[in-house]
Amino acid sequence: GDVYKRQILFYVAPPLVFISGILFNQFGIFYFNIVMNHTVFVPIVNTKGDVMGKAIASEAINRKNDYINPVIRIAVASHGMLFLLPRPKCNVFEKDKIDLLMEGYLIYGETLEQGAHRILRQTLPTAPLDHLHFNFMYHFENEATNRLVYLFTLDLDDDSILCNKNFKGGKLWTFQQMEHNLGRNFFSSCLEYEFEHLEAIIYTREKYKES
């Protein structure tokens, strides 16, 4: 009986271990592929916007890196004013500072247009896409972030879609009101940088409407 058991172990067990190892390894590869398929990546770019590589979004977003990641910001304008609200408390970067309504990272594989449309649809699903315009790009770096910002504006004739309980603390600001609060650590760093550009863009647009 013992000899028979030893023969089974000698002849049967090794192939079983080998087959089990293959199956376990295949399962590991399968599981890894599932995880990677659900892992979101963001592009790594240079200051011109050329894609140089990619990084796992969760790692790139939660800390400052040596590499640059592209960020889309959308300024919502209505009747010559900007809609601003406090940044979410969960934000790693400048939480509670007054800022634009929309900001998000470009996802690896997206075009700039696709990324902007995704961010707009997530926040204002009924907003007209043809009122969304790209304005300019700039590199912004401080002790907390390293980003290439693509700034868009969304012009709304009807501001009723901004009456949303999710936009806590949000309101329309005149540029004069904003100017009185510049340099007081009240607005986000990016908004402080964008202020003069946005003022010129919105002023020109409003003048064009009047003519």
PLM region descriptions:
Residues 34-73:
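Acidic, metal-coordinating catalytic segment for phosphate/diphosphate chemistry
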Residues 90, 111-113, 117, 121-160:
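Active-site segment of metal-dependent pyrophosphate-handling enzymes
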Residues 103, 151-153, 162-191:
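NUDIX/MutT-family hydrolases
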Residues 10-16:
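Intrinsically disordered, low-complexity segments enriched in serine/proline and basic residues
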Residues 58-72, 77-118:
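Conserved Nudix-box catalytic region and its N-terminal flanking loop in Nudix hydrolases
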Residues 189-211:
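Charged phosphate-binding loop/patch that engages nucleotide di/tri-phosphates or the phosphate backbone
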